Design a protein with these regions (language model features):
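Extracellular and secretory-pathway beta-repeat/beta-biased strand scaffolds
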Residues: 1-392
């Protein structure tokens, strides 16, 4: 006997009924059925909708840690084995670390919270020890199945004001995301800090699986052994929105060193505020993406004059010197040579006066890139009738 009920609710019959249970093999002898597993149904449904497949039983899941400020570097310690590996054909699991909308700092082995720091302190070695296929710090990634099911978005109810990777801290995973959502704050990597994905294995999933990342009103720094397609961030408000991305800032302890960013697939910086790539930064990757509110292309002196007059739109300044710095990939630590530079603008590309962006190496006569990709809803040119803007 049994009671009929609605699954997941407290609604059920008061009276018991007679229930007959028939084994599946016996039932198949009584009639003929077209049977399909959940995984096969989900794959077929996703193909019909033209979107990536949903989560399947072969996929590993996510571990989410929501930490409170004031606990010091000893608030999180991990000396175990994380089981984030997927079954064959599945997506690897993720480690998601949140700071209860506080500031987050990540320090090196044995280090304590920085003097005067008010926020969540974590040691990089403890985060690396989980062995996750994807490490996300500052927000929770989500994919809503159905229309728009190819967008990886981030939960608007959680976030971090800022994230700083201190001197001596190195994050290592197949894929690392840092996200912050407070204007006036920053995602900062000090001199001597590093994010390295080389030799860590495959990312959980990437653009080749049909996914597109949308950071929303957040700044984002990401390194991956896969291919990342990233939309520009949305415009924020005075209290919530993208902040700066500062790579290679002087260390709080005064110790100088190189900031290292190495991946086998992609390096992405997304913000509509300041983006600083200091001379101390060494990076190597196959695909470099800058996603910004806009790009202002022209000589630095002219752009500075326009900004002083208050007529320069918000955006990242770009000239030949900046382009040359972006093309200085470093393959000395085993990273692949740079192949693709992607510049995605939310608003527009603005060209001022006579300007040229040249990817060719003067010594060899060959382009330092296989692909230069510009993504923008509009391209504007400002100058007189003789002004020429060129990209080569």
């Amino acid at each position: 006997a049994g009671q009929l009920s609605l699954v997941g609710t407290g609604v059920r019959d008061e009276l018991f009924r007679q229930v007959l249970l028939t084994p599946a093999d016996v039932l198949r002898r009584h009639s003929q059925y077209n049977e399909t597993s959940y995984s096969d149904f989900a794959m077929a449904d996703a193909a019909r909708r033209g979107i990536p497949r949903p989560m399947l039983p072969v996929d590993a899941r996510s571990l989410r840690l929501d930490l409170l400020a004031g606990g010091g570097a000893d608030a999180l310690a991990f000396d175990g084995t994380g089981l984030f590996q997927a079954a064959r054909g599945g997506y690897g699991g993720s480690l998601v670390v949140l700071g209860n909308n506080q500031r987050i700092e990540i320090v090196g082995a044995g280090a304590q919270a920085s003097e005067g720091f008010q926020g969540v302190t974590l040691r990089a070695d403890d985060l690396n020890a989980f062995g996750a296929a994807r490490m996300v710090i500052g927000s929770t990634p989500a994919v809503l199945y159905g229309q728009g099911g190819n967008y990886v978005t981030f939960d608007i109810t959680d976030g971090a004001q800022s994230i700083v990777l201190r001197n001596g801290a190195e994050l290592a995973a197949p894929e690392v995301f840092l996200l912050a959502n407070r204007p006036g704050e920053a995602i900062s990597l000090e001199q001597g800090a590093a994010i390295v994905t080389l030799g860590r294995g495959a990312a959980a999933y990437d653009a080749r699986d049909g996914f597109l990342y949308a950071s929303g009103g957040r700044s984002m720094l990401a390194l991956s052994n896969g291919v990342l397609n990233v939309l520009p961030p949305e415009a924020g408000t005075p209290d919530s929105g993208p902040g700066d991305i500062l790579l290679g800032v002087p260390a709080a302890d005064g110790v100088a060193g190189e900031t290292r960013l190495y991946s086998e697939g992609s390096l992405v910086a997304a913000t509509d505020k300041r983006f600083v790539l200091d001379g101390s930064v060494r990076y190597g990757t196959r695909n470099l993406t800058l996603a910004a509110g806009g790009f202002n292309v022209g000589e630095q002196a002219l752009l500075a004059e326009l900004a002083e007059r208050g007529v320069l739109p918000t955006g990242l300044a770009l000239d030949q010197q900046v382009l040359d710095r972006l093309l200085q990939g470093d393959a000395s630590e085993g990273a692949p040579p740079l192949e693709t530079l992607v510049l995605n603008a939310r608003d527009a590309f603005n060209f001022y006066g006579d300007v040229s962006l040249d990817s060719y190496d003067p010594s060899s006569g060959r382009s330092r890139l296989s692909r230069l990709v510009l993504g923008t809803p509009a391209i504007y040119g400002y100058g007189d009738s003789d002004s020429v803007a060129s990209i080569r």
